[in-house]
Amino acid sequence: MAQQTFTGRKRVRKFFGHIREVAEMPNLIEVQKASYDQFLMVAEPPGGRDDEGLQAVFRSVFPISDFSNASMLEFVRYEFEPPKYDVDECRQRGMTYAAPLKVTLRLIVFDIDEETGARSVKDIKEQDVYMGDIPLMTMNGTFVVNGTERVIVSQMHRSPGVFFDHDKGKTHSSGKLLFAARVIPYRGSWLDIEFDAKDIVFARIDRRRKIPVTSLMFALGLDGEEILSTFYKKILYKRIKEGWRVPFDANRFRGYSTVNDLIDADTGKVVLEAGKKLTVRAARQLQEKGLKALRLSDEELVGNYLAEDLVNPKTGEIYAEAGEEITEKSLKALNEEGYKELPLLDIDHVNIGPYIRNTLSADKNMTREDALFDIYRVMRPGEPPTLDSAQNMFQSLFFDSERYDLSAVGRVKMNMRLDLDAPDTHRTLRKEDILAVIKTLVGLRDGKGEIDDIDHLGNRRVRSVGELMENQYRIGLLRMERAIKERMSSVDIDTVMPQDLINAKPAAAAVREFFGSSQLSQFMDQTNPLSEITHKRRLSALGPGGLTRERAGFEVRDVHPTHYGRICPIETPEGPNIGLINSLATFARVNKYGFVETPYRKVKEGRVTDEVVYLSAMEEGRYAVAQANISLDAKGRFTDDLIVCRAGGTRDVVLIPADQVDYMDVSPKQLVSVAAALIPFLENDDANRALMGSNMQRQAVPLVRAEAPFVGTGMEGVVARDSGAAIAARRTGVIDQIDATRIVIRATEDLDPTKSGVDIYRLMKYQRSNQSTCINQRPLVKVGDSVAKGDIIADGPSTDLGELALGRNVLVAFMPWNGYNFEDSILLSERIVKEDVFTSIHIEEFEVMARDTKLGPEEITRDIPNVSEEALKNLDEAGIVYIGAEVRAGDILVGKITPKGESPMTPEEKLLRAIFGEKASDVRDTSLRVPPGVQGTIVEVRVFNRHGVDKDERALAIEREEIERLAKDRDDEQAILDRNVYGRLADLLDNRQGVSGPKGFKKDTKITRAVLEEYPKSQWWLFAAPNDKLMAEIEAMRKQYDESKKGLEQRFLDKVEKLQRGDELPPGVMKMVKVFVAVKRKIQPGDKMAGRHGNKGVVSKIVPIEDMPFLEDGTHADIVLNPLGVPSRMNVGQILETHLGWACAGMGKKIGQTIDAYYQRQDLKPLRETLKKIYGDDETIKSLNDGELIELGRNLSHGVPIATPVFDGAKEADIEEMLKLAGFDASGQSTVYDGRTGDEFDRKVTVGYIYMLKLHHLVDDKIHARSIGPYSLVTQQPLGGKAQFGGQRFGEMEVWALEAYGAAYTLQEMLTVKSDDVAGRTKVYEAIVRGDDTFEAGIPESFNVLVKEMRSLGLNVDLHNSKLGVPPPAEAAE
């Protein structure tokens, strides 16, 4: 187990799993990293790159020739230059983390001989060309684009290849199945071949108008006879005197209904009477008895079809064409001509249908030319076809590698489905492929073979980042190619260099567009480490080239048997995207063809081996696979004779003998995703609730104090490590220095003389995540600790001792409490608020820009007109708020003034202005203020200045601080380097004979440490010993030391130079200030909370501690949940978790008591015994020394953490045993007393510890109030929504309610002065100010809008204020 790590020794989880895990779980973000590495191939030397990724893109577009073939631009190699800014700098400055791509191109100019047209090389020029920036992936599998972290989600799409399907009888009213085949390339035109209701076969190209499939075959170069001979066998009927002799074939005659008797042609015996049907069995028996041929009469030939043209050999006249149907009349004519043999098609209408023959006779095109013209008209309607253009167009549709690409996957799939053997480098269609598709389709119509299941994971593949990016870059390069061709033809090619031909903008724009606005490039969900990991492992069926929500049916969204171990059946969003967005299962990985694979243990002759094999869905279909929880004996043999397996193409569950099992699952959790694998007792929860549980864990807000769950699943450590939230040591070493912002480790292994022996880990302090949660890392180590490679040395957000910790363990009682937990409401104790159990920190970012306006530049300053000194108290002299200031809504964060439009001045004013410099009147206050509902502490301020703009005092102060920090890093690294190098040098020189040395050293004296101490360290290099090998080693060491020193200094200077250089700001912006406010959010009524089992609710009340129900020992419950939330939801896992959590806490208490006893008696034996009772013979605990044991005991005293893996966890008996061990009743229920009266409740209550999360749906972000605010320009009604500071909508139903109450005045107020009666609302305000409460409603603005709308339709409407009975004025009457 992973317990032997640094953090694993501080807290040991008791493991309840029974199944030994053979396979290592792959790194959880491998999907992203491996795919992008394969695309960039940065690590490969430029010459030795395989033809994939970026290399393949360049190879496919280059070489580019000009239109006259007189010159050619070739691709040689590409390489990346180091990125301009590192990841952190990009995040802070709002830049994209990318590396410049440098491509070496070779321009070859030819001389063309005008007579022969032969080319000879005239000139070759090579040059490096800059081809835009390519975004790089960070260590955690994300991209930093414009300063924000983004994730490229992998896409599931239909694999290229051929698919056979039918319409399920929906098209035709008779319910007849219409079969269709579709050839889908990776890029290029789709080819559909389909039956219609009359059984004629049609082809469609790119979903256009259909053409008979025979026209397609004509276009491929076949004629009518060849088409028929390709699809049908030929049978020779011979004339004998009683009729026709036909060879007997059991397969052909099975199901044959006779009209006359069937007679053996050789003996004349009747083998089957008239009116009977020849069964398969009877036909086979006849063949076995030696029946060679049958005798058929003339009328039985009628209705058959000719296989060849019948031609008069003398005159060349055609009597009948191939495919023609034989009628009585035509048969009579043929008999008269004296034909003794008739070649007929093997069509019996039972086993073989006449579909291709019927299509051929229905086809109007008779020649290849007609067919090509027809296809051309379909593809390009309205253009007159010529034979050339039609031929080229057809050729380019399927046979041109520029336009059509099946891809290696498509070719492999096609070969498998059609039993072909084309190499996977042949990526266009061939004539054989198209004919094989038509044959297979006709075979399906004849009842041979099966249609494909398009939701089978063998028919869907994953496009990951690398591939998506490759396609995007190819699009960019193809756009560029056109421009290059034109430019090559228009410039003087002899003088031009490759650089002049290339404009890299289209390629860079394609990349930028993909990262900025593609549906698959998403703003990373960074609420907590789990949400990051899940986002990177997501598979989406949406996006370009994928499905759309509206069109996706039920089948695509449903769970398929092949999802087992590949895609999680549980984790998917609720709502319109359900089933379209999935998550990769824990052990799954994507293979080189893009198919999802899952690992299995190989079974040899009934014995399970430790050999792990990854299988894709197609490969798995051939094997029988047993589940992971099948019982095995000590040697790995199955204990049962019959084993439950998934077998066959449909993956049905069957019982088969042990020796027929091929594979076995590696782990029970391999079928669920990471989020679902974190739910303990998942097997006891209903699937719908488990889905909510996995989705809600992703919304858990990191709390101020993270606490790992008592009841975990053993996955917590893996998630914390792979997500990058917790920091792992890169090399084994010793902690040298440590503070809250960084850890310095002196490496003791993997020492490379060319690299620094020091690792510095910078910790993130109070950084804002994409979702405004707080990212804060804190060290777990102290100076002198030894850590191994991969050990966790610092916790991040939502991690505790290197384990994922999304919530807190709280004491729960399941009971109703005064109706406050009605409908899933949650009742909390005041202790939770007082002790900050569910308090979280959120960091809001506000920014302000000072622009250069037409009227003059805006200015960031403290000098703001008409603002009191009180309002400026938090600002420094530059007008920017101090770090640490407490601010609330409406406070100024950054003072800013904007010039107002000048009103013309009189000369006197000008004079006064010149004398007194009075300038306050022509600027307005546009300061950045804290928005409503925000209150917190300033944690960080960043100031950005444009190049050439003077920095203010604040910017300089920030810069100085940053430089000091960098200098400290440099000095520390230098000090450790010195210590390392001089330590090694002293070891080498110690006890050597000195040949020479620094000034004052006597020759041939022994060099000892004491001698060395007399000289400054820098002079130690001057000592020399008579050993050449030693001196060479010292020289190499010195060289390396000088280089390291130089490198350190250079890195420091580069960073300082970047700091002092101006920032790249958007056009027109002179200065930008970003202010970060940390908001502390305590839990309060209205906040949403949830457990891990889909048990969610809203906090309804926070009750004083003394009123909460309490146990016999006086402990008060922290949280009270409604027991009615369990039975109907069927998530019993929460109850089991509660019981087990209760046992964990009970055992923790016991350990705490033994530690208290140790402090009095100084005897550790009781502690070791208690731990042995709980953990059994645990190796880790045995290996701990006394100090480590006490630290472990202290960590366990709150509760003993346990791991109960999904589908292999603690059973009911285990829970009861744990409860007894902790000294509790095995029922898990306790006597509880009412906190308000002190009375005992009527019955015992389930009490225990449950792990609760606080979700990112906080009432502070949702609740909102408005008095006066912005109004809509057209309707003059208040805007809606919190973001717009809008009002509350009083809708149709609310109006009905007031009407029902007869509240006329309230209603009038709602519809007029509180909404869009502009004059009225102003008057109301004035009246209120005067203390008067009368008002009059006017005309709502909506009425004017209606009038304007009617006028725009040509209906004039006027409003006349006339009293009843008074005639309207004359002009109105006209």
Swiss-Prot record:
Keyword NAD annotated: no
Enzyme class: transferase
GO cellular component terms attached to this protein's record: DNA-directed RNA polymerase complex
Superkingdom of origin organism: Bacteria
CDD domains for this protein: RNA_pol_B_RPB2
Record-listed E.C. numbers: 2.7.7.6
Catalytic activity: RNA(n) + a ribonucleoside 5'-triphosphate = RNA(n+1) + diphosphate
Coiled coil residues, start to end: none
Alphabetical list of InterPro entries matching this protein: DNA-dir_RNA_pol_bsu_ext_1_sf, DNA-dir_RNA_pol_bsu_external_1, DNA-dir_RNA_pol_su2, DNA-dir_RNAP_su2_dom, DNA-dir_RNAP_su2_hyb_sf, RNA_pol_bsu_bac, RNA_pol_bsu_CS, RNA_pol_bsu_protrusion
Assigned keywords, A-Z: DNA-directed RNA polymerase, Nucleotidyltransferase, Transcription, Transferase
Listed GO biological process terms: DNA-templated transcription
GO MF assignments: DNA binding; DNA-directed RNA polymerase activity; ribonucleoside binding
Subunit comment: The RNAP catalytic core consists of 2 alpha, 1 beta, 1 beta' and 1 omega subunit. When a sigma factor is associated with the core the holoenzyme is formed, which can initiate transcription.
Free-text function comment from the UniProt entry: DNA-dependent RNA polymerase catalyzes the transcription of DNA into RNA using the four ribonucleoside triphosphates as substrates.
Family (UniProt): Belongs to the RNA polymerase beta chain family.
Protein name listed in UniProt: DNA-directed RNA polymerase subunit beta
Source species taxonomy: Bacteria, Pseudomonadati, Pseudomonadota, Alphaproteobacteria, Hyphomicrobiales
Gene name linked to the record: rpoB
